Structure formats: structure tokens, C-alpha cells
Swiss-Prot record:
The gene is psbD. Belongs to the reaction center PufL/M/PsbA/D family. This is Photosystem II D2 protein. Its EC number is 1.10.3.9. It comes from Cuscuta obtusiflora (Peruvian dodder). It catalyses: 2 a plastoquinone + 4 hnu + 2 H2O = 2 a plastoquinol + O2. The keyword Magnesium applies.
């Protein structure tokens, strides 16, 4: 009997193993299994947005011009939401609304649902990409966990809020000025700035910016491997590859400034992660509340007193009047399908009008 030693020539790999080898191969741009979701969805979302902002009008859904072809610029062009009459239809190209007609589909606002859905799955694919790469190189998954915060905000604003309202019409359109209009709408109809979840979101984002600036400045300040420059700014190279800053010096500095300071890098960086991520999560929860038409803080006693005493006014009562003005002006313009007509005497007029 002859026994052959050595590697078997038989290929025992199945299709899954072959795909896994190719997808996770070490290359310039990692693909991975998450890439099967990320790259097509990101391509279609961006492609749909560029197509819509270049060619597609919003005349049939909002009564607006919204494309470069109609004279808009980068700040005013948008892929706008479908009409309110279409409610929560997915507006599939082959669905009963468009019936396979691409031009009709664009006129109805089909590009908005196309961009929103592919954008959401693209963002989820990017988060899964971070999970997959972290597992491959044996890192913790905190990058992916942090990225869940902007995903939560996107999903709550573009999907959950309009699902709680009468249709996709009340979601933000994809454009700069369109997002600004949506913010004004949120303020006028929901008093969003006085919502505690919005306050937590603002504290998280601005607090994170402050922490980031302080952290970057402190690291630059405490580099101890210097050059031969004549002054502090020339002597330290901000692109120095080695980590040569002094945590002890930084701790002593901030202890003298504030009386307290971070004692180790882990707690410091966890705090820098915690502040913005928690703020964005809280904002997303607040938007879910708005989908259910939950109210912000109401100081009714001040409103009653202001209505009875013409000499009593607070910043709160002034803002409530401002919100009423936003509603009166926006409702007729923003919801033309309702045919709202307000008498001239109820519309707020400023000095410029």
C-alpha cells in the first residue's frame, strides 16, 4: 500500500468560503460582506440625489422649482418629498402609482423614497463595515456603536417622524434650503427648541466640539519631543508620528485651571465618545416623540398672564407668538393641497412687511 504525504490537490472550499476569501481579501479598499450592502446603496442614494437635484422638478408635489435645470443653485436645489396625497406609499417604480413610467415616477416624488431608503441602508452598511473591520483586526466595536447615533437621527427624522404624520410629505426634502425649511417647520409646529430632548442634543453636540478642541489643544501643548525652532509654535511639529505627549503634565495643567482633571486616557476618551453619542440618541428619541405629537415644555401660567396683562411679556411668550406666525405663514404655503386661506388681519406683519 502506498501512502502519499503532502497537500491534497482537492479543493474542499464551497461557494461561501470562496466568496469570503475574495470579499475579505487585504486590498487598498476593503470590501467585506458589509460592502455588499454599503456600496450599491451608497451609489444609488448619491446617484438618485444628483439626478433629482439636476433634472427633477417639485412642481407636482410642492409647487416649487427644485433643480439646476429650473434655475436653482447648490443651496436651493433638492430632492423633495412626495405629495401628501400619496401618504406613506413606497412609490416603487413598478408600483400602481408610476406603473413603470420613469418620468411619472420622478414627478410623483419617487426619487425621495428611493434616496431615503438606499441612504438609510447605506448608512447601516457603513456601520456594519466598521463592525466587520473591527472584528478582523481584533478591535472593540466602539466606532460602530458611535456611528449608530447619526443613523438613529437619520431614521427618526426621515422615517419615524413622517410615519407618525399623514405622509412622507412632512419629512425633510434632501437639500440645504429644504432642511432649513424643515427646521423652521419643527419650531413653528412643535416648539422644538424648548423640547428637553433637543436641549440634550445641543448639549451633546456643542459639548463634544468643546471637548474635541480642548483635547486637541492639550495634546499639542504637552508634546515634549521638540525641534530646534526659536519659539513654541515652530518648535513643535503637529504631524509628529510618535505619541510623545505628557498625560501627567496635562493633568497638572487642568487640575490648576478647573480644580479637577481626567486622570487616565481611557476615561477621557470614553467621555469624549459618550457626550456626542448620547446627545444624538436623545435627539432621535425626541423626534420619535414629535412623530406622536408630544408637546415640548408649556408654561401656561405665563401665557395666561400675558393674555390678561399687556405689560407682562417674557421671552417664552414672545417665542410662542413667533411660532404662531410661523404656522400662519407656513401652513398656506407649505400645504397647498389644503387650500388654506387666512384673512389678512390674522397674518403677522413685521416692520419690513
Amino acid at each position: 500500500m502506498t501512502i502519499t504525504l503532502g497537500q491534497s490537490t482537492k479543493n474542499d472550499k464551497d461557494l461561501f468560503d470562496t466568496m469570503d476569501d475574495w470579499l475579505r481579501r487585504d486590498r487598498f479598499l476593503f470590501v467585506g460582506w458589509s460592502g455588499l450592502l454599503l456600496f450599491p446603496c451608497a451609489y444609488f442614494a448619491l446617484g438618485g440625489w444628483f439626478t433629482g437635484t439636476t433634472f427633477v422638478t417639485s412642481w407636482y408635489t410642492h409647487g416649487l422649482a427644485s433643480s439646476y435645470l429650473e434655475g436653482c443653485n447648490f443651496l436651493t436645489a433638492a430632492v423633495s418629498t412626495p405629495a401628501n396625497s400619496l401618504a406613506h406609499s413606497l412609490l416603487l417604480l413598478w408600483g400602481p402609482e408610476a406603473q413603470g413610467d420613469f418620468t411619472r415616477w420622478c414627478k410623483l416624488g419617487g426619487l425621495w423614497t428611493f434616496v431615503a431608503l438606499h441612504g438609510a441602508f447605506g448608512l447601516i452598511g457603513f456601520m456594519l463595515r466598521q463592525f466587520e473591520l473591527a472584528r478582523s483586526v481584533q478591535l472593540r466595536p466602539y466606532n460602530a456603536i458611535a456611528f449608530s447615533a447619526p443613523i438613529a437621527v437619520f431614521v427618526s427624522v426621515f422615517f419615524i417622524y413622517p410615519l407618525g404624520q399623514s405622509g412622507w410629505f412632512f419629512a425633510p426634502s434632501f437639500g440645504v434650503a429644504a432642511i432649513f425649511r424643515f427646521i423652521l417647520f419643527f419650531q413653528g409646529f412643535h416648539n422644538w427648541t424648548l423640547n428637553p430632548f433637543h436641549m440634550m442634543g445641543v448639549a451633546g453636540v456643542l459639548g463634544a466640539a468643546l471637548l474635541c478642541a480642548i483635547h486637541g489643544a492639550t495634546v499639542e501643548n504637552t508634546l515634549f519631543e521638540d525641534g530646534d525652532g526659536a519659539n513654541t509654535f515652530r518648535a513643535f511639529n503637529p504631524t509628529q508620528s510618535e505619541e510623545t505627549y505628557s498625560m501627567v503634565t496635562a493633568n497638572r495643567f487642568w487640575s490648576q485651571i478647573f480644580g479637577v482633571a481626567f486622570s487616565n486616557k481611557r476615561w477621557l476618551h470614553f467621555f469624549m465618545l459618550f457626550v456626542p453619542v448620547t446627545g444624538l440618541w436623545m435627539s432621535a428619541l425626541g423626534v420619535v416623540g414629535l412623530a406622536l405629537n408630544l408637546r415640548a415644555y408649556d408654561f401656561v401660567s405665563q401665557e395666561i398672564r400675558a393674555s390678561e396683562d399687556p405689560e407682562f411679556e417674557t421671552f417664552y411668550t414672545k417665542n410662542i407668538l413667533l411660532n404662531e406666525g410661523i404656522r400662519a405663514w407656513m401652513a398656506a404655503q407649505d400645504q397647498p393641497h389644503e387650500n388654506l386661506i387666512f384673512p389678512e388681519e390674522v397674518l403677522p406683519r413685521g416692520n419690513a412687511l
